């Protein structure tokens, strides 16, 4: 991570203008590296903003991992592309940061199963199609959930549930998967799980109660245990699929990049 301070009036500070990716590290192996890098660069291209090169992102990541052994320990790798200058059309106004962090305790606990609640309507994710640092709605919703004794808050679009505050949401539907509907962040981890299968739509409350799970780079995959205090079913086939996917993330070299 750059040791240089960020100006107090930088766009990323005053207006949350920046972008980031969070990756699971297993030792020095970055899980779903290619897909995360692709999403970051595609976002910047779609918004016609300056972008770092893939080589620069990889170099910064390697530097951040200095001294870390290639063992089975799990950590978080955060990649940030943030606006520190006022003229955001100029490459010089942007800064690339890469940092290694511990996985948050709430995330580790959520892996064992998540108690979820419906996010209050007053909390809405800003520009949900982009992984931006403008994250107030998600942070506020997750804080609200934690105060209620839950691990995750779920956003709705009308009557359909779309995503969690920090995770993607998929309904099992007896193996006919559904999730990643309009209005949610395109999830790298959920796409890796689905591998092109499933219906791309919001899901109903009844579908979630019948069996559903959360997906995220650090959460990996976790069943939803309850929704607003109502118990959710956990079909054995769904639990087996979750565990198989988690093991793939940890051990499949095709899904990893050694830094």
Positions of predicted regions on the chain:
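Ordered, amphipathic secondary-structure segments that act as subunit-interaction surfaces
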Residues: 70-81
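Helix-start/capping segments and mature chain N-termini
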Residues: 1-63, 84-259
């Amino acid at each position: 991570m750059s040791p240089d301070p960020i100006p107090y009036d930088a766009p990323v500070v005053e207006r949350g203008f920046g972008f980031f990716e969070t990756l699971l590290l297993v030792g020095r192996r970055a899980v779903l590296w290619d897909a995360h890098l692709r999403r970051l660069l595609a976002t910047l291209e779609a918004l016609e903003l300056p972008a770092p090169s893939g080589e620069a992102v990889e170099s910064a990541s390697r530097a951040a991992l200095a001294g870390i052994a290639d063992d089975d320990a799990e950590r978080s790798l955060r990649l940030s592309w943030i606006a520190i200058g006022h003229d955001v059309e100029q490459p010089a106004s942007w800064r690339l940061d890469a940092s290694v962090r511990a996985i948050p305790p709430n995330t580790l606990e959520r892996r064992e199963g998540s108690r979820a609640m419906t996010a209050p309507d007053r909390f809405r994710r800003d520009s949900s199609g982009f992984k931006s640092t403008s994250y107030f709605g998600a942070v506020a919703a997750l804080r609200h959930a934690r105060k209620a004794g839950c691990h995750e808050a779920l956003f709705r679009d009308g009557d359909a549930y779309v995503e969690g505050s920090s995770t993607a949401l998929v309904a099992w539907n007896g193996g006919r998967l559904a999730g990643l509907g309009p209005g949610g962040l395109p999830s790298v981890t959920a796409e890796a799980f689905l591998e092109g299968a499933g219906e791309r739509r919001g899901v109903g409350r009844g579908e979630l109660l019948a069996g559903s799970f959360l997906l995220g780079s650090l959460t990996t995959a976790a069943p939803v245990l309850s929704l607003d205090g109502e118990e959710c079913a956990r079909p054995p086939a769904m639990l087996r699929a979750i565990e198989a996917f988690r093991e793939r993330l940890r051990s499949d070299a095709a899904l990893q990049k050694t830094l």
